[in-house]
Design a protein with these regions (language model features):
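Conserved ABC transporter NBD signature motif
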Residues: 62-73, 77-78
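ABC transporter nucleotide-binding domain
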Residues: 171-265
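A short, proline-enriched helix->beta-strand linker immediately N-terminal to the Walker B motif
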Residues: 149-153
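The feature captures the beta-strand-to-loop junction immediately N-terminal to the Walker
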Residues: 39-41
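ABC-family P-loop ATPase nucleotide-binding domains
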Residues: 76, 80, 86-142
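Catalytic Walker B motif of ABC-type/P-loop ATPase nucleotide-binding domains
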Residues: 155-159, 164
Length: 296
């Protein structure tokens, strides 16, 4: 049996602005039906990658495929199957929210009006308000409504919570994304580009960390939590001088020792136990902590 076609497949992608390479040899595969995180600091190359997927930029080397299709050759067919929310949203300023959504719905073969009504209520958006009177956060909310109502197979989100207050961010993450994926389990895919990793912790299935245009780490979320550990030991006296092969980072503070382990946690714990600490504990890293440890 052949492997299912990924929602997104990027191979050896390169894109430069003049002499400055924004993306350098990026490889990334997003299986259909998952919520995939593209993590990186500002300037890591995330938005350039998104623009290549949307055919707003053409890869200078390498390739991108969505549902097995080259967006440069199948632009309309690909765009019918996705929705995109950028980090900055602009609408026709003279239109109301209602007119804007009706206008955008006219380009779609399907539009879930029940979902639209529900989201407008949840976001407390006034359909009669002109878009030029909306705050940045409200414009983002309208864009999210417009992205989710067509119920596309693929949702591309570039810093989607930018400009939203903490309460609305939580509402968006817990309710909106959840509702989108629950509508057609296994078929709806999300690629979310963000540096606010903790906010998406419970939704991400797999992720890639980008730095300087490169993919530096790709893992399943559960795999990352099982591999990366934070180990703490407290001693009666000063921290013994010892080597800990496999520790990514070591921090000594008085009588306390903290280590970040990547796959070597059990061996490090046994070595620490032999040093007779007063206390010894370990816990899985969050995805944000994995991100920080990887780029530190």
């Amino acid at each position: 049996m052949s492997e299912p076609t990924p929602a997104i497949e990027i191979k050896d992608l390169v894109y430069a602005y003049g002499r400055a390479e924004a993306v350098h040899g990026l490889n990334l595969t997003v299986p259909a039906g998952c919520c995939y995180g593209l993590f990186g600091r500002n300037g890591a190359g995330k938005t350039t990658t998104m623009k290549c997927l949307l055919n707003l930029l053409r890869p200078q080397r390498g390739s991108v495929r969505l549902f097995g299709l080259d967006p440069a050759k199948h632009d309309v067919e690909v765009k019918r199957r996705l929705a995109y929310v950028p980090d900055y949203v602009a609408f026709y300023p003279w239109m109301t929210v209602r007119e804007t959504l009706d206008y955008l719905a006219s380009f779609r073969s399907h539009w879930n009006r029940d979902t639209e009504s529900n989201l407008l209520d949840r976001f407390q958006l006034d359909p009669g308000k002109r878009t030029d009177a909306l705050s940045k956060g409200q414009r983002t909310q309208v864009a999210l409504v417009a992205a989710i109502c067509p119920e596309p197979p693929l949702l591309l989100l570039d810093e989607p919570t930018s400009g939203l207050d903490p309460i609305v961010r939580r509402e968006f993450i817990e309710t909106v994304i959840g509702a989108y994926q629950e509508g057609d389990p296994g078929k709806r895919t999300i690629l979310v580009s963000t540096h606010l990793i903790s906010e998406f912790e419970g939704l991400i299935d797999e992720f890639t960390i980008m730095d300087g245009g490169h993919d530096v780490l790709t893992l399943g979320a559960d795999q990352a939590r099982g591999r990366y550990q934070k180990i703490r030991a407290r001693f009666a006296g000063s921290v013994p001088q010892a080597e800990f092969p496999g520790a990514l980072h070591i921090k000594r503070n008085g009588r306390e020792l903290e280590l970040i382990a990547n796959g070597g946690g059990p061996e490090i714990i046994e070595k620490l136990r032999a040093l007779s600490p007063e206390s010894l504990s370990s816990e899985a890293l969050t995805l944000e902590e994995v991100f920080v440890a990887t780029l530190k």
